[in-house]
């Protein structure tokens, strides 16, 4: 028995150590849940939580086995070095390093989730590849979440203490039996490893992907809880992001249902007004009092008195949405009319596609175009995107520093960019230097991590509510001063202003933490001299390009996935976004959730907390849903197929 135990000891120790990792992944998932509990709390029962935890085991198994292949091979491959202490110290070191890193990634992503509402994928490396401040960001978050660091240290220490080393005594080993036993162990384990990585033994089982998490969830946001970050990272390495579905074999039928190619709406001569697009970092609809008249039983005032004043003079919409959850999603949506499906296309090989946008369209009509962002050149890939879509000039931190009219790098926030207040004044001044007509866009930065404001404003805008609110107040003040300065310029009355956010951010209201609420962004159109109006329509970021083209009476065909919302009947306005493998399509007073093959849920927009899935309501399906459901599916499928075909065929202009 002693000899038999020695021979099988490497296998027993390997299995034991791998089982420890399930505990590590389980604890990391519970921490992920607790850190972001408000996003998962709705409808979370004990039985549903158990269902998601059970589903999580499938993805944990895959991640554990993929990341530990080197360790498994080293432990089970027949090497006579394995009876030596240094060899097992090496194996233990590899085990702790690999799995310590996996744990750290999971814990870090628990903090990052609230910004994206999903698990991190490999596109994060492209997204932040040009940032030189990642060390400072990491240090700031480490200090802010020091308790996660303590948990990390304790868990790695626990792995170290509980780690089991094979008990081998070379004096009692029969080497040929030992070699045979280890080879057989490796051969026996191999199919289980392959099956665990794939997600099952059956030959019909395709290797599991991120989208498989949706079979365990009731809401798209919950997929992040079922998944783990190491799995999400390795499953998106080198993968084809855009796959063309076969919903429509007849292209003409698809074109009749939906086309992103727009024809001129009328023959009115083009009005060459200036166009100014303000993309305000993380400036979600939730923070704006004027867009939340019924929130908190009508008592809510928000944090944006200056934007509230602007709204009183502008065109807004009863429902408005962003088309992604990251800054790099917002840029193509707002400036080129291209939403984010699956991954930000500008972080994929499709970034080499030829893309049009507001800038290129208007440059062709004699406009001078410029993009402004107060960070260093190259930050977030904005400069590359701006150039590819037709912006003739780019002004960043370096250009601000070189302008003697302003404070130079003394106005740098120490982390990301020039503070919003001075940079927006610079923006206004530079537009006064430009020849009309011009088209410009600015991307602000201060309402962003690490959520700090200039020292001189800390007593004016103290901490309140969530950490984001003081930053929103500061940026709102900066916007108010910008419009005051702009109103004194000769170009002001000949300008169309559009204000939106790149995406949403932290929330402290349940409505804005739902699958759809997390995409609620403002779309504000201000044209001096035009009567203000709240239109009972659905608007989205990708509508900005065609709406501006309609306001200008642009005379040529152009490309955008959105619509001219001002010249579209309310019943025909819609919005679309993508979250954790689910497409959300908003139209006709409902939101439909579609996983690419079938509809998972339908909610009435009046069901603000998305608590009543109408797919389970037989009466609704027989009555209202009998016509509505197939119509919405048909339209959404046409949008998806048009998107995927054009991405893969380079037909985005």
Model-flagged regions — what are they?
Residues 2-227:
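Transmembrane and membrane-interface helices of multi-pass
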Residues 6, 10, 48, 86, ...:
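Exposed alpha-helical structural elements
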Residues 56, 60, 107, 137-138, ...:
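Residues that form generic nucleotide/phosphate-binding pockets
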Residues 110, 136-139, 282, 503, ...:
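Conformational gate/switch positions in structured elements
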Residues 201-560, 567-573, 577-579:
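Soluble catalytic regions of membrane-associated enzymes that act on cell-envelope
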Residues 529-653:
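Membrane-interface soluble catalytic domains
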